[in-house]
Amino acid sequence: MTRGEMKYEGKAKRVYATEQAGEYIVEYKDDATAFNGVKKAQIMGKGEINNAITAHLYPLLEAAGIPTHFLEKLSDREQRVRAVTIVPVEIIVRNVAAGSFSKRLGIEEGTPLPRPVVEYCYKSDALGDPLINTDTAVALGWATEADLARIRELSLQVRDFLVPYFEARGVRLVDFKLEFGKLSSGEIVLADEISPDTCRFWDAQTNEKMDKDRFRRDLGGVEDAYAEMLRRVTQSV
């Protein structure tokens, strides 16, 4: 399979057309951004690690009955995916208070939530990915009520799979962001990635951060944290 025209370039990935109708190649970059692109840097090897983690987890999610766009890992930085139209509504699933949630609501970071909290954001770097509700998404034509119900259902299924998976590997899944897309058939599938870029991972014993917060908060050790997460994700237990 060969890369054709670049269809899209985001903060962390490039998407290319292929000779196969309905399939794209996704290339993972080492570019790191925070605060909706305000802070920028390079994290050496990040693209390879995020590609490897996503390529490991998505087939497991598929086996658990969660449809995804993932088809196969092509190289250290590339994977083959099904072409989707991205729904411009990002989903954040929170298990523990952290980040903007703690600041916005005055809840101490690290406070366990008695049930998962699902938040919706409009996917727009220019606007800072603002929080929205489902009424807004429907009124502005970003998604239908049925789309959003299915997206919520799938998001919680992802959560129910990932929480015990990471617990077994000594990792606390604090929160995570998901993106979904529509196939040409109209089916909604999980797209994008699951990685230290899109999740808050804390060590279960020490609460040490093993994700992009190390970059956001200038904690250092970013490359080592990403490498450790790859080791744990692929660890057999």
Curated annotation (Swiss-Prot):
Span of the secretion signal?
A: none
Catalytic function, reaction form: 5-amino-1-(5-phospho-D-ribosyl)imidazole-4-carboxylate + L-aspartate + ATP = (2S)-2-[5-amino-1-(5-phospho-beta-D-ribosyl)imidazole-4-carboxamido]succinate + ADP + phosphate + 2 H(+)
Q: Which GO terms describe its biological process?
A: 'de novo' IMP biosynthetic process; cobalamin biosynthetic process
Can you tell which superkingdom this protein's organism belongs to? Bacteria
Pfam families in the record: SAICAR_synt
Name the InterPro entries on file. Answer: SAICAR_synt/ADE2_N, SAICAR_synt_PurC, SAICAR_synth, SAICAR_synthetase, SAICAR_synthetase_CS
The record's keywords, sorted A to Z, are:
ATP-binding, Ligase, Nucleotide-binding, Purine biosynthesis
Family the UniProt entry places it in: Belongs to the SAICAR synthetase family.
Q: This protein is called what?
A: Phosphoribosylaminoimidazole-succinocarboxamide synthase
